[in-house]
Every structure is written in C-alpha cells, then in structure tokens.
Amino acid sequence: MASRKEALARRANRVRRHIKSVANGRPRLSVHRSSKNIYAQIIDDVAGKTLASASTLEKDLRGSLKTGADTAAAAAVGKLVAERASKAGVSEVVFDRGAFIYHGRIKALAEAAREGGLTF
C-alpha cells in the first residue's frame, strides 16, 4: 500500500497529465493550499514563466483578512489573481488543483477567479 505522500504525488501527477492534454497552449492557474495560507499563480508552461500570482501572505491582503486559512481569504486571493491576470492579458486558463479536491477553499478561490473574469 502506498504511503500518504506517494498517493498525493500520484494524484497530483494524474491531474497535471490531464491538464497538459487539454491545455492547448493556455496558461494554468496553479493553486497550493497549506494549513495557514493559500497561494495561486498563473503559469505559462510554454515559456516557463509566471504571469501573475497572489497569496494570503501579501501585505495588502493580510491587513484585511482575519486569517489566511478560510474561504473568505481564498476568495480574496481568487479575485486578486484574476485582476492581475487581466492586467497581464490573460483571460483563459486551465485550473490546476494539484492533489487537492475541488471543495472548500479551493472551490472558493476558483469561483472568485471566475467572477473576476477568468474562464476555465
């Protein structure tokens, strides 16, 4: 039986393999969640560059949030990354949830990014 770490890595690889097959040159919105914060970045895999990023560790968000580990914080990060993506000229992305299930904070970030103008 695989360890928890191996199972997470296998699930993340499975998701990323699927993303690469459907990307068609679109950048990906990669999301990482820790116990205290949430991070999002839009990555152009063709050029190997990060086009936009946002996290709950940023000073302008930290002051307005009670904690970085709830759905309100995730929604704020989603709106901010969508705003920065539109400034960078990105409107279509592929959502990369990694090994995280589409629920809770991950879902809140994705829905806020959609409301902010990103399509995926």
Curated annotation (Swiss-Prot):
CDD domains the record matches: Ribosomal_L18_L5e
Range of residues in the leader sequence: none
Pfam families with a match to the protein in the record: Ribosomal_L18p
GO terms under biological process: translation
Listed Gene3D superfamilies: 3.30.420.100
Sorted UniProt keywords: Ribonucleoprotein, Ribosomal protein, RNA-binding, rRNA-binding
Database matches in InterPro entries: Ribosomal_uL18_bac-type (IPR004389), Ribosomal_uL18_bac/euk (IPR005484)
Cellular-component GO terms for this entry: cytosolic large ribosomal subunit
GO molecular function, one term: structural constituent of ribosome
Record bears the keyword Signal: no
Family according to the record: Belongs to the universal ribosomal protein uL18 family.
Assembly notes: Part of the 50S ribosomal subunit; part of the 5S rRNA/L5/L18/L25 subcomplex. Contacts the 5S and 23S rRNAs.
Task performed by this protein: This is one of the proteins that bind and probably mediate the attachment of the 5S RNA into the large ribosomal subunit, where it forms part of the central protuberance.
Protein name (Swiss-Prot/TrEMBL): Large ribosomal subunit protein uL18
Organism annotation: Rhizobium etli (strain CIAT 652)
